[in-house]
Curated annotation (Swiss-Prot):
Primary enzyme class: transferase
Signal peptide: none
Superkingdom as given in the UniProt entry: Bacteria
Keywords linked to the UniProt accession: Cytoplasm, Lipopolysaccharide biosynthesis, Nucleotidyltransferase, Transferase
Protein name: 3-deoxy-manno-octulosonate cytidylyltransferase
Organism field: Vibrio vulnificus (strain CMCP6)
Lineage: Bacteria, Pseudomonadati, Pseudomonadota, Gammaproteobacteria, Vibrionales
EC number annotated for this UniProt entry: 2.7.7.38
Amino acid sequence: MSFTVVIPARYQSTRLPGKPLADIAGKPMVQWVYEQAIQAGAQDVIIATDDQRVADAVAVFGGKVCMTSPNHESGTERLAEVVQLMGIADDHIVVNVQGDEPLIPPSIIRQVAENLAASSAPMATLGVAITSEEEVFNPNAVKVVTDKEGYALYFSRATIPWDRDAFARGEVLTEHSLMRHIGIYAYRAGFINTYVNWQPSSLEKIECLEQLRVLWYGEKIHVELAKEAPPAGVDTPEDLELVRELIAAKS
């Protein structure tokens, strides 16, 4: 099985300007993500950016860049442009890895690609069991419910499924673990253009979850439990400092 990883790397960030180039142990953040994707066994790793400063930094460490429009409204639109510009075949598997996850385990990058290859869905993703009471009711921890074959029934910021009896007894964490969605996706390349040409659905607008568009239009997303739980990504200066400390502790 071969697959390509695309890493969106926008320079502009409200909470952390210049995020892709933030220094972590002497390397820009985007290089850490790139190296994790290489370790996952990707046939090709492409960094998608709309900023020449990012492109120049990637050239220094020998990565491949695809310059994209600065006017995309979503990461999926940027991904569709990469597929078109790079001439990626419709049946090829493309994994979208966020550019702010320098510690993402290579194992789950490969796992989501293998998950898609083994299913009939046009799209696949991963989840982890929720083990924290705080996450059960946290709207920032997106929940996913699947059918018996692992296909997503729904994604929500709400607590789903609602364990009526256990919650009534004050039991938040039960044997029926809720699943938290991890924001890593694999696509069949030809499906990406279909996806971005659909009109946004009312459900995705309500939940602010773009993946609900796929379910709204009757397509499937396959979900597996991740082999490893990835560390949190970098959204703030505090997150960046934590990652620096974690990497320093390992070296």
